[in-house]
Protein backbone atom coordinates (compact mmCIF):
# COMPACT_ATOMS: atom_id res chain seq x y z
CA UNK A 1 0.00 0.00 0.00
CA UNK A 2 1.46 3.31 -1.06
CA UNK A 3 0.86 5.77 1.76
CA UNK A 4 2.97 8.56 0.22
CA UNK A 5 1.29 11.94 0.13
CA UNK A 6 2.55 14.95 -1.79
CA UNK A 7 1.94 18.44 -0.45
CA UNK A 8 3.49 21.89 -0.52
CA UNK A 9 5.90 23.21 2.09
CA UNK A 10 7.60 26.57 2.14
CA UNK A 11 10.41 27.39 4.50
CA UNK A 12 13.18 29.83 5.30
CA UNK A 13 16.46 28.04 5.85
CA UNK A 14 15.59 25.32 8.40
CA UNK A 15 12.24 26.72 9.58
CA UNK A 16 8.99 25.49 7.99
CA UNK A 17 6.82 28.56 7.36
CA UNK A 18 3.69 26.76 6.19
CA UNK A 19 1.23 27.25 9.12
CA UNK A 20 -0.56 24.01 8.25
CA UNK A 21 2.58 22.08 9.24
CA UNK A 22 4.09 24.45 11.78
CA UNK A 23 1.45 25.84 14.10
CA UNK A 24 4.02 27.96 15.92
CA UNK A 25 5.06 29.91 12.85
CA UNK A 26 4.27 33.60 12.56
CA UNK A 27 5.64 36.49 10.58
CA UNK A 28 9.12 35.47 11.71
CA UNK A 29 12.00 37.86 11.17
CA UNK A 30 9.93 40.26 9.05
CA UNK A 31 6.68 40.19 11.03
CA UNK A 32 4.76 39.25 7.86
CA UNK A 33 4.51 36.00 5.89
CA UNK A 34 6.27 37.05 2.69
CA UNK A 35 7.15 33.39 2.05
CA UNK A 36 3.51 32.54 1.30
CA UNK A 37 3.38 35.24 -1.38
CA UNK A 38 6.50 33.80 -3.00
CA UNK A 39 5.08 30.27 -2.81
CA UNK A 40 1.98 31.44 -4.66
CA UNK A 41 4.27 32.52 -7.52
CA UNK A 42 6.40 29.37 -7.74
CA UNK A 43 3.94 26.63 -6.73
CA UNK A 44 1.94 26.41 -10.00
CA UNK A 45 5.15 25.54 -11.88
CA UNK A 46 6.34 22.66 -9.68
CA UNK A 47 5.75 18.99 -10.42
CA UNK A 48 5.53 16.29 -7.75
CA UNK A 49 8.90 15.82 -6.09
CA UNK A 50 10.35 19.17 -7.15
CA UNK A 51 11.91 21.64 -4.74
CA UNK A 52 12.73 25.23 -5.69
CA UNK A 53 15.27 27.34 -3.82
CA UNK A 54 15.06 31.08 -4.36
CA UNK A 55 15.69 34.57 -3.07
CA UNK A 56 12.75 36.89 -2.36
CA UNK A 57 13.75 40.45 -3.23
CA UNK A 58 12.21 43.90 -3.04
CA UNK A 59 9.71 44.94 -0.40
CA UNK A 60 7.36 43.38 2.15
CA UNK A 61 3.55 43.72 2.27
CA UNK A 62 3.99 46.26 5.09
CA UNK A 63 6.35 48.39 2.97
CA UNK A 64 9.58 47.41 4.70
CA UNK A 65 12.64 46.35 2.72
CA UNK A 66 13.44 42.64 2.52
CA UNK A 67 17.15 43.49 2.49
CA UNK A 68 18.81 46.70 3.56
CA UNK A 69 22.24 47.96 4.51
CA UNK A 70 22.99 51.11 6.46
CA UNK A 71 19.32 52.07 6.28
CA UNK A 72 19.20 51.82 2.47
CA UNK A 73 16.96 49.26 0.81
CA UNK A 74 18.18 46.78 -1.78
CA UNK A 75 15.11 47.48 -3.92
CA UNK A 76 16.11 45.41 -7.00
CA UNK A 77 14.03 47.78 -9.11
CA UNK A 78 10.82 47.27 -7.13
CA UNK A 79 8.67 49.84 -5.32
CA UNK A 80 7.09 49.70 -1.84
CA UNK A 81 3.39 48.73 -2.04
CA UNK A 82 0.83 51.53 -1.88
CA UNK A 83 -2.12 49.19 -2.01
CA UNK A 84 -2.39 45.55 -3.08
CA UNK A 85 0.90 43.66 -2.72
CA UNK A 86 1.93 42.55 -6.23
CA UNK A 87 4.56 40.21 -7.64
CA UNK A 88 6.66 41.98 -10.25
CA UNK A 89 5.90 45.42 -8.82
CA UNK A 90 6.64 45.21 -5.10
CA UNK A 91 8.64 42.01 -4.87
CA UNK A 92 10.34 39.41 -7.01
CA UNK A 93 11.52 35.82 -6.82
CA UNK A 94 14.91 34.74 -8.17
CA UNK A 95 15.45 30.98 -8.41
CA UNK A 96 18.99 29.70 -7.90
CA UNK A 97 18.55 25.96 -7.34
CA UNK A 98 16.14 23.15 -8.29
CA UNK A 99 16.00 19.51 -7.20
CA UNK A 100 13.77 16.54 -7.93
CA UNK A 101 13.22 13.80 -5.34
CA UNK A 102 11.90 10.52 -6.77
CA UNK A 103 9.50 8.17 -4.89
CA UNK A 104 12.49 6.23 -3.51
CA UNK A 105 13.90 9.36 -1.92
CA UNK A 106 16.82 9.81 -4.32
CA UNK A 107 17.54 13.46 -5.05
CA UNK A 108 18.47 14.72 -8.52
CA UNK A 109 20.22 18.10 -8.68
CA UNK A 110 19.47 20.34 -11.66
CA UNK A 111 22.59 21.84 -13.23
CA UNK A 112 22.99 25.63 -13.21
CA UNK A 113 22.23 25.69 -16.93
CA UNK A 114 19.10 23.57 -16.43
CA UNK A 115 17.88 25.99 -13.75
CA UNK A 116 18.23 28.86 -16.21
CA UNK A 117 16.45 26.93 -18.98
CA UNK A 118 13.62 25.74 -16.72
CA UNK A 119 12.94 29.28 -15.50
CA UNK A 120 12.79 30.60 -19.06
CA UNK A 121 10.37 27.82 -20.04
CA UNK A 122 8.14 28.47 -17.03
CA UNK A 123 8.23 32.26 -17.26
CA UNK A 124 10.03 32.65 -13.93
CA UNK A 125 13.18 34.62 -13.15
CA UNK A 126 16.43 32.82 -12.35
CA UNK A 127 19.37 34.47 -10.65
CA UNK A 128 21.53 36.45 -13.06
CA UNK A 129 24.12 34.29 -14.81
CA UNK A 130 27.25 36.32 -15.60
CA UNK A 131 29.43 33.50 -16.89
CA UNK A 132 29.06 29.81 -17.69
CA UNK A 133 32.14 27.73 -18.47
CA UNK A 134 35.44 26.55 -17.08
CA UNK A 135 37.05 28.83 -14.51
CA UNK A 136 40.43 28.50 -16.24
CA UNK A 137 38.95 29.93 -19.44
CA UNK A 138 37.68 33.09 -17.75
CA UNK A 139 41.18 34.55 -17.46
CA UNK A 140 43.29 32.63 -20.01
CA UNK A 141 46.34 34.79 -19.31
CA UNK A 142 46.67 33.30 -15.81
CA UNK A 143 49.03 30.34 -15.63
CA UNK A 144 47.32 27.26 -14.17
CA UNK A 145 50.69 26.08 -12.85
CA UNK A 146 51.66 29.25 -10.95
CA UNK A 147 49.45 30.00 -7.92
CA UNK A 148 46.38 29.90 -10.13
CA UNK A 149 43.85 29.64 -7.25
CA UNK A 150 45.12 32.78 -5.51
CA UNK A 151 45.54 34.75 -8.74
CA UNK A 152 42.10 33.72 -9.99
CA UNK A 153 40.32 34.85 -6.82
CA UNK A 154 42.27 38.10 -6.72
CA UNK A 155 41.31 38.90 -10.33
CA UNK A 156 37.71 37.87 -9.81
CA UNK A 157 37.34 39.94 -6.63
CA UNK A 158 37.98 43.15 -8.58
CA UNK A 159 36.40 42.26 -11.94
CA UNK A 160 34.08 45.10 -13.00
CA UNK A 161 32.41 42.79 -15.54
CA UNK A 162 30.82 41.12 -12.52
CA UNK A 163 30.25 44.48 -10.78
CA UNK A 164 32.70 43.60 -8.03
CA UNK A 165 33.32 46.61 -5.74
CA UNK A 166 30.69 48.54 -7.72
CA UNK A 167 27.19 49.72 -6.93
CA UNK A 168 24.42 47.17 -7.41
CA UNK A 169 23.49 47.02 -11.12
CA UNK A 170 19.90 46.01 -10.36
CA UNK A 171 18.96 48.42 -7.56
CA UNK A 172 17.67 51.96 -8.00
CA UNK A 173 19.16 52.90 -4.64
CA UNK A 174 22.90 53.38 -4.50
CA UNK A 175 23.92 50.32 -2.51
CA UNK A 176 27.03 48.14 -2.87
CA UNK A 177 26.88 45.05 -5.05
CA UNK A 178 26.78 42.07 -2.70
CA UNK A 179 29.04 39.83 -4.78
CA UNK A 180 28.79 36.64 -6.80
CA UNK A 181 28.24 32.92 -6.30
CA UNK A 182 30.38 30.29 -7.98
CA UNK A 183 28.40 27.11 -8.65
CA UNK A 184 30.33 23.94 -9.40
CA UNK A 185 28.69 21.61 -11.93
CA UNK A 186 29.20 18.25 -10.24
CA UNK A 187 25.64 16.98 -9.61
CA UNK A 188 25.98 18.20 -6.02
CA UNK A 189 24.79 21.33 -4.29
CA UNK A 190 28.24 22.89 -4.16
CA UNK A 191 28.51 26.67 -4.36
CA UNK A 192 30.74 29.38 -2.93
CA UNK A 193 30.09 33.06 -2.25
CA UNK A 194 32.58 35.80 -3.05
CA UNK A 195 31.31 38.97 -1.37
CA UNK A 196 32.48 42.47 -2.20
CA UNK A 197 34.65 44.22 0.40
CA UNK A 198 32.40 47.29 0.28
CA UNK A 199 29.38 45.14 1.11
CA UNK A 200 31.18 43.36 3.95
CA UNK A 201 32.29 46.70 5.40
CA UNK A 202 28.72 47.98 5.32
CA UNK A 203 27.50 44.75 6.88
CA UNK A 204 30.05 45.08 9.68
CA UNK A 205 29.00 48.68 10.41
CA UNK A 206 25.34 47.62 10.55
CA UNK A 207 26.16 44.86 13.03
CA UNK A 208 28.08 47.34 15.18
CA UNK A 209 24.90 49.45 15.31
CA UNK A 210 22.87 46.43 16.39
CA UNK A 211 21.16 45.95 13.02
CA UNK A 212 20.70 42.23 12.39
CA UNK A 213 19.83 40.74 9.01
CA UNK A 214 17.81 37.60 8.38
CA UNK A 215 20.86 35.39 7.75
CA UNK A 216 22.44 36.36 11.07
CA UNK A 217 19.11 35.93 12.85
CA UNK A 218 18.69 32.44 11.41
Positions of predicted regions on the chain:
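Core nucleotide-handling region used for phosphoryl-transfer chemistry
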Residues: 1-218
Amino acid sequence: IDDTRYDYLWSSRSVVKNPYYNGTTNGGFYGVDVWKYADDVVRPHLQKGMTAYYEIVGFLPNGGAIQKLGGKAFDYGFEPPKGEYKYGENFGVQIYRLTYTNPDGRVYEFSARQVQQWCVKEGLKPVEEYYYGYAKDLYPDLSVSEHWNENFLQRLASDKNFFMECESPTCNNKVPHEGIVIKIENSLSEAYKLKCIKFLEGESKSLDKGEVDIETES
